[in-house]
């Protein structure tokens, strides 16, 4: 019976093993680099609520840059949960991997509270040291060191839209308020709002947020395609 040279060629087998090993190393390296890039340099998030409509679509996908953690007025940020649980290293690693493939929609470990246990996307409207008050769902801001109030739109770095619609009279005092008294933010405290001022849960409910809760800034909405935009 005639034998193939591959059956007895030691050098051929070694070369074949090296090719396979190099291919495996290449695939693993690409996967790790991609995972690190999409988790620590630029990662995708899925918007599963209408709290930021109309500018940020429900069921949309946007990219967040975690290096941009010092926002200006009017910019959109990605916030950590209010009651985020401190996890051991192995659980955090599992969360990181699964969360990457789930577009930041699901983590197997940690809080599952629908209001305070999830990440959220909100717009920064007032900075540390600013004074503010709200009237008819529009925030008026007096920047730190200045003497006059301006609307949130006049101070924003880019124009944006908010959603306000009529609610029944019986709703007065329920849900998110459309009026707030004059208040001054403390050091390292930001005031954030949902663009949907009727449905969104934001600083009107939980107050100003610390910078440690800001995990990055939204820079690009990629889906739906007809609403693709840079922030």
How would you describe each model-predicted region?
Residues 43-58:
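Alpha-helical transmembrane signal-anchor/signal-peptide segments
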Residues 2-21, 54, 58-231:
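Soluble "head" domains of membrane/secretory-pathway proteins
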Residues 2-4, 29-34, 46:
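N-terminal intrinsically disordered, low-complexity, charge/repeat-rich segments that act as generic
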Residues 24-40:
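Hydrophobic membrane-insertion alpha-helices, especially the h-region
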């Amino acid at each position: 019976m005639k034998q193939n040279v591959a059956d007895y060629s030691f050098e051929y087998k070694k070369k074949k093993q090296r090719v396979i090993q190099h291919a495996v190393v290449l695939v693993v390296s690409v996967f790790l680099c991609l995972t690190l890039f999409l988790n620590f340099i630029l990662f995708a998030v899925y918007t599963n609520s209408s709290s930021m409509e109309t500018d940020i679509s429900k069921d949309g996908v946007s990219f967040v840059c975690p290096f941009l953690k010092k926002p200006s007025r009017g910019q959109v940020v990605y916030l950590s949960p209010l009651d985020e649980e401190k996890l051991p290293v192995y659980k955090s690693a599992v969360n990181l991997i699964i969360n990457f493939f789930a577009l930041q929609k699901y983590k197997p470990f940690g809080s599952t509270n629908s209001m305070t246990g999830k990440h959220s996307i909100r717009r920064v409207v007032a900075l540390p040291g600013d004074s503010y008050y709200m009237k008819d769902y529009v925030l008026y801001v007096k920047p730190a060191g200045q003497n006059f109030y301006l609307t949130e739109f006049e101070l924003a770095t880019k124009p944006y839209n908010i959603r306000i619609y009529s609610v029944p009279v019986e709703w007065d005092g329920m849900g998110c308020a459309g009026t707030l008294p004059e208040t001054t933010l403390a050091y390292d405290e930001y005031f954030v709002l949902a663009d949907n001022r009727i449905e969104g849960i934001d600083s009107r409910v939980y107050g100003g947020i610390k910078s440690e809760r800001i995990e990055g800034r939204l820079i690009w909405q990629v889906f739906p395609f007809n609403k693709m935009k840079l922030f």
